[in-house]
Amino acid sequence: MSGLLQLDEESLYDHIFERYTLLTSNNDSLKQDLGIVDRTVSKITIDIDQFDFNNKKSNNDFYSIEINQPITSLNSSSVNNNSTTGYVVWSTTPFFTRWLIFHSNASIFRNGGSIELIDQDDELKLPPMFSNSVGLLELGSGIAGILPVTLGNFVGSFIATDQIGILSTLKTNILENLSQLNRKIVTSRSLNLNLDVDESTLLKRSLLSLECLPLDWELFDIKDTTKLDPALLSLFKEKETIYVLAMDVIYNEYLIESFLSTIQNLKSLAFKFNVNLNCLIGIQLRSEEVTTLFLEKAIIDYEMKVYYIQDNILESSRFSIYMI
């Protein structure tokens, strides 16, 4: 079962030491790579399934996603302002998706409830993530569209965001994998889908509002909400709870400041509209210095409450998930 370890300006260093020591002890059983699933092919299949395949009960317990990768863009110095990491599939997102949907340890996040605060003799109440009253907002989606076409089955709204140069391939991949959204009727202005849905259709499956929007962390500003994208503004006006998801976006020191500024702005927006907002940030553990700097900036400079999700499945992997 998962628990939350709140980090402060002192305990973060103990946490970093212990987590990277554990990572080193597991090195023999873990892949030693940067985390790209396969940079040699232009089309890749990602399967998301049960941890115990013998418990598979229906087609709803398995997802197979076909992803187009513009691998020539990964090595280009002229596309997307030379920011090219989003053009391939990274392993953090499939790992997180499988853990969240299928593992019993993640049920507290799926269904909500009280989760143990480690070393505090206390608990924190989490709202359910899997509910039609919940919206998911993904930062740094990349081109794959894995989270929208899987987690979209369990929520009322999903907004996938990235820099504008990424969005065309992201939209293509989502459209080609709509069959994975087998629990929902999808409506979307950005994808031009089912803008007029009749009531008889909604009797069979519930509605998912799914949008792909540009969101540049360095330019994101909430001072004038009338300038925000209408779909993003509607998310904050209409949903009781929003979970922000950001998978493998912390991989160098240059992105940390603008990312945390964006999280801070989103939290301010949530406060304005009385929305319960939590952020789940998945990190592949590469540079100890980058992970430390991220935690220092979040906890010390931005004075954010940062929790480490302590979980045996996560700790036997190369990934850490933090909640802000």
UniProtKB/Swiss-Prot annotation:
Keyword Magnesium: no
Claim: Methyltransferase is one of the keywords in the record: yes
Entry superkingdom: Eukaryota
Residues where S-adenosyl-L-methionine binds: 90, 140-142, 162, 217, 247
GO cellular component: cytosol; protein-containing complex
Family of the protein in this entry: Belongs to the class I-like SAM-binding methyltransferase superfamily. RKM5 family.
Protein name, UniProt field: Ribosomal lysine N-methyltransferase 5
Organism: Vanderwaltozyma polyspora (strain ATCC 22028 / DSM 70294 / BCRC 21397 / CBS 2163 / NBRC 10782 / NRRL Y-8283 / UCD 57-17)
